[in-house]
Design a protein with these regions (language model features):
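Core catalytic region of metal-dependent phosphoesterases/phosphodiesterases
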Residues: 5, 10-109
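Active-site-proximal loop/helix segment associated with metal-binding centers of metalloenzymes
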Residues: 96, 112-190
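Extreme N-terminal starter segment of soluble prokaryotic enzymes
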Residues: 1-3
Length: 190
């Protein structure tokens, strides 16, 4: 079985058995794909105790959790996880059954070809992106905090990697060509 859901932003309540009873019949060979803004890897520098608890809980579900990146991910941390080959494409292995489907990959899952290409441009930064090492950071932060425009802080709540790199786009093109530019599904974030 293959299930697809949208943004979690670190809230995985929807995977409780009382809300998602279908999992009672699922195994690790069944998959739930989160279409970006996973949010399970968010704490600034290292895995927090809360993240450990949540990621271990996801890993204990009877299914395998897969996700593509959105625009609200901690890319500094996400890219530190080991890269492995899985079902024909590259993943970051967060836990044994919690995997980040990297951009530009073609996976064969449930006899279907799935092209993954996560990421998106943030829409919630009208106030701008602050640089934490800016000498005026505290002043700018205080000013923006009193205002009504949403803002982000570079490498705290915003990363330029929210958008794909040229290398990721080229790898995606090459992987699609290997499959004659034919896949069954495209999983992305919007």
């Amino acid at each position: 079985m293959l299930f697809i859901t949208g943004d979690c932003h670190g809230n995985f309540e929807r995977f409780n058995p009382s809300i998602f009873p279908e999992q009672k019949e699922m195994t690790k060979e069944d998959y739930v794909i989160i279409c970006g803004d996973f949010g399970g890897v968010w704490h600034k520098d290292e895995e927090s105790p809360e993240e450990t608890m949540v990621l271990d809980w996801l890993d204990s579900r009877p299914f395998t959790t897969l996700f593509v990146c959105g625009n609200h991910e901690n890319f500094d941390r996400l890219y530190q996880y080991p890269v492995e080959d899985w079902h024909g494409g590259k993943v970051h292995k967060i836990r044994d059954s919690v995997l980040h489907l990297m951009r530009g990959q073609v996976f064969e899952i449930e006899e279907k070809k799935i092209f993954s290409f996560g990421g998106a441009s943030s829409h919630d930064i009208q106030g701008g992106v602050l640089e934490p090492d800016d000498p005026e950071f505290e002043k700018k932060y205080a000013t923006l905090s009193r205002g009504y425009l949403p803002f982000r802080i570079n490498h705290w709540s915003w990363w330029k990697q929210e958008l794909p790199s040229e290398e990721e786009m080229e790898e995606g093109r090459q992987n699609l060509e290997k499959h004659d530019n034919k896949v069954d599904f495209i999983v992305t974030h919007s």
